[in-house]
Amino acid sequence: MTLKNALLAFRNAINILDKNLINLLAKRKQLSLNIAHTKVKNNYPVRDIEREQMLLKNLTILGEKHFLNKKYIESLFSIILEDSVLTQKKWIKKYNLNKYKLEKISFLGSFGSYSHLAAQKYAKKHSKILTDKIYKNFSDVITSVEQQQSTYAILPIENQSSGLIIEVYKLLQKTPLFIIGNIYIHANHCLLAKKYTPILKIQKIYSHIQPFKQCSKFISLFPNWKLSNTTSTSEAIQHVAKENDNTIAALGNESYGELNKLEVIAKNISNKRNNITQFIILAQKKTYITNKKTHLKTIILISKKNENCEKIIRNILHKNKITLLKLKYYVTSKVLLEKIFFIEIENIYCIKHILKQFTIEIKCIKILGCF
């Protein structure tokens, strides 16, 4: 074999080894990605300095056995380890970004509605983002989560002035979503109109049906006013702001009115001074709470035409030493005398036993969720 042929043979052998090294490095990178997935799943940190130091030590010992320079092995594998860490960090960052993007909150109306304020408050506390879609009814808000367009839906369920929001309660009976939390918002309604609009000149008011109910005493002072329902308070404010008409006004929140260059004609007009609305957060997955002190379950109970249904519920809970936090109901049919009960109870770890007792007298039971 000539010298030239010998060199060519050796170089070809090295080329094959280099290709094998590339393939091995690619396989190592894939394993690093698998490790990143496992770390995210189990909430482990990306970097394990102790393991890296131990690995370098073992590799240099192994290298010395093969007559490889210690600094050469340390330098080579330090680069490989650093690349592995960067690969994992990049993957985890992308994973978290995608997860964050998916965790959107749907709510009624647009920017400036009370539902938007509630969603904003919840998003800030739990590091979520708000959807940019505008939903004009409660049903569409729920559907957005059922169809995985959003991760969470936020809906008003009760107001101190107007009471239960029946439309939402009816939707809760049908949806497969679960309640995972709640939040409270002060609904300080204002009468908003174009600047320099005298209150006596106003003829028509725009708002969602709930503010009309919550400000009924104030509205009754002006019997000639015509009331026009909108899908949300933000829509009402936008409409009044858009129209060049000083005979119309909107009920809504002051800050959003100011953003739309409307003037506060009257404030603190709710029937109750401390007008609070409770919102619930719905999701496809249940939450599991291990802290007994904060463990609540909401249950929907549909009466079996039984006038003593409320008494039965209270007796069963009392017998099992379960604290009743809240009991609300509404009549679905005056003819059938059917009532739907919603209860919140504390520390319910014997749920199956309780459900068996309820089913003796109750037509339908549905657990809405824990929070």
Curated annotation (Swiss-Prot):
EC number, as in UniProt: 5.4.99.5, 4.2.1.51
Boundaries of every Prephenate dehydratase domain copy: 104-284
One cellular-component annotation, GO: cytoplasm
List of residues binding substrate: 11, 28, 39, 48, 52, 84, 88
InterPro entries tied to this protein: Chor_mutase/pphenate_deHydtase (IPR008242), Chorismate_II_sf (IPR036263), CM_dom_sf (IPR036979), CM_II_prokaryot (IPR002701), CM_P_1 (IPR010952), Preph_deHydtase (IPR001086)
Main location class: cytoplasm
Catalyzed reactions: chorismate = prephenate; prephenate + H(+) = 3-phenylpyruvate + CO2 + H2O
Chorismate mutase domain mapped to chain residues: 1-92
PROSITE patterns for this protein: CHORISMATE_MUT_2, PREPHENATE_DEHYDR_3
Keywords: Allosteric enzyme, Amino-acid biosynthesis, Aromatic amino acid biosynthesis, Cytoplasm, Isomerase, Lyase, Multifunctional enzyme, Phenylalanine biosynthesis
Pathway: Amino-acid biosynthesis; L-phenylalanine biosynthesis; phenylpyruvate from prephenate: step 1/1; Metabolic intermediate biosynthesis; prephenate biosynthesis; prephenate from chorismate: step 1/1
CDD domains according to UniProt: PBP2_Ct-PDT_like
Pfam family, one: PDT
Disulfide bonds: none
Family matches, as Gene3D superfamilies: Chorismate mutase, Periplasmic binding protein-like II
Protein name per the record: Bifunctional chorismate mutase/prephenate dehydratase
Gene behind the chain: pheA
